[in-house]
Each structure stands twice: as C-alpha cells, then as structure tokens.
C-alpha cells in the first residue's frame, strides 16, 4: 500500500524516441604518415546520426519530493550499406575504375541506469522534475570498407574498327575493418513533467541526455524524448 504524503514504491513504463550519434576517429583516407593506416571509410561512417524507438521500464521509490529509480532499455540495431563506382578516362587510352563498398552495423545493446529525481510540486496535478542519471551501457559497432581500383588500357583499332580494350593490367584493393564494443559507465541528465491522473497514476513526459562514454576512438551520445505512465503502490 502507498504511504502518506505521496510516498511509496512505483513502477514506470515508457516509450522513448532516441536520437543517436556515434562518432569514430578513423585514420584519414589520405594518411601517409608513419604508423597510420590508409582507410576508405567515408565521413558518413565517421559521424553516424540515426534514431530509434524503444521501450524502457523503471522501478523506484518516491520519498515525497525526491525519487530514485533503476531503469533498463534495449536499443534497435542499425545497419547501413553504401556502394559507389567512378570511372575516369586518362590520356584517351587509360581508364581507371574505382569501386567503394562500405558496410556498417551499430547496436546500442542495452542500458541499465540509476537516477535521482526531484519533483517540483506546482499544484495538485503538475509536477515538473529534474534529475541526474548514471548508467552502465553496452554498445557495439563494426565497419567493413573496401576500395578496389582497376586499370584498363584501350588502344585504337584500324580505320573503321572498334578500339581494343585489354584485360585489366592493374588491380589494387585496400580494406579497412574495425569492430569495437563499449562497456562503460556514463552520465546523463533528466528533465520532464508529470501529470497526476489519479493519486496513484501519473502521466510522464520526459527528456534525457546521456553520454555513454568513450572506448578508444568511439564516442556515443543519445538524446531521448519519452512518454509513459508511472504507478505508485
């Protein structure tokens, strides 16, 4: 049973829209310095901006002003594939064909957090709130990028005859593969407003920003807007 003055344990279910950004510091494609790696990864894969809709569940305790809660969420997997071809004709004889194939996956596997929230009681119904959150998050990502360059030699034929294209005499391929897994403790902030439908049931609209931390050359941040209900026992 709920305690007096709005105190007691509670559960909350939310549907969250997350704007996700994952940033990689890959070596530049033109890097030639000692100890660097030539990469064909495009800027698109360096700064991934995507979004997802996911559920979140929380359990906590309301102290009548302050609340603490533990929450858990899983995020969807992101996939992307890019392919491009360019053909250049040099000196009317030499043709160079460049093919780029890039594949990427991104999975914010899970987030387990603990938050402390303070409710501002404006009246009997509306309660804006702010808070802080610490969470243990798991993020996976992988990139597979290849660049293939093929050279053809074209020679002019006899008068009225079609030119002759020789078999490829130059074929080079560069590859860049990378896979990282982040398991870090990150920090975030929370804000929102609650509307009491009944003394025990609250409609909650919230926002949270979370920095998931950094592993080597990978940084991951999310901005989330959510709508849910909170039931206090």
Swiss-Prot record:
Superkingdom as given in the UniProt entry: Bacteria
Chief site of localization: membrane
Keyword annotations of the record: Cell outer membrane, Membrane, Signal, Transmembrane, Transmembrane beta strand
Pfam families linked to this entry: Opacity
Entry keyword annotation includes Transport: no
Summary of the function given for this chain in its UniProt record: Implicated in a number of adherence functions. OPA proteins are implicated in pathogenesis and are subject to phase variation.
The protein's name: Opacity protein opA67
């Amino acid at each position: 049973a709920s305690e007096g003055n709005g105190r007691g344990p509670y559960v909350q279910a939310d549907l969250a829209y997350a704007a996700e950004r994952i940033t990689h510091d890959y070596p530049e494609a033109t890097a030639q310095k000692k100890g660097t790696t030539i990469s064909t990864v495009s800027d698109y894969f360096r700064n991934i901006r995507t979004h997802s809709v996911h559920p979140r569940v929380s359990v906590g305790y309301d102290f009548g002003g302050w609340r603490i809660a533990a929450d858990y969420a899983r995020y969807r997997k992101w996939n992307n594939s890019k392919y491009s071809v360019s053909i250049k004709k040099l000196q009317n004889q030499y043709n160079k064909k460049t093919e780029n194939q890039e594949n990427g996956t991104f999975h914010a596997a899970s987030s387990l957090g603990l938050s402390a929230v303070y409710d501002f009681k404006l009246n009997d119904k509306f309660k804006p709130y702010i808070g802080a959150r610490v969470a243990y998050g798991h993020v996976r990502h992988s990139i597979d990028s290849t660049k293939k360059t093929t050279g053809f030699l074209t020679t002019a034929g006899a008068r009225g005859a079609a030119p002759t294209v020789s078999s490829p005499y130059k074929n080079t391929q560069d590859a860049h593969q990378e896979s990282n897994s982040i398991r870090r403790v990150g920090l975030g902030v929370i804000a929102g407003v609650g509307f009491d439908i009944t003394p025990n049931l609250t409609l909650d609209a919230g926002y949270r920003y979370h920095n998931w931390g950094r592993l080597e050359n990978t940084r991951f941040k999310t901005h989330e807007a959510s709508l849910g209900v909170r039931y206090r026992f």
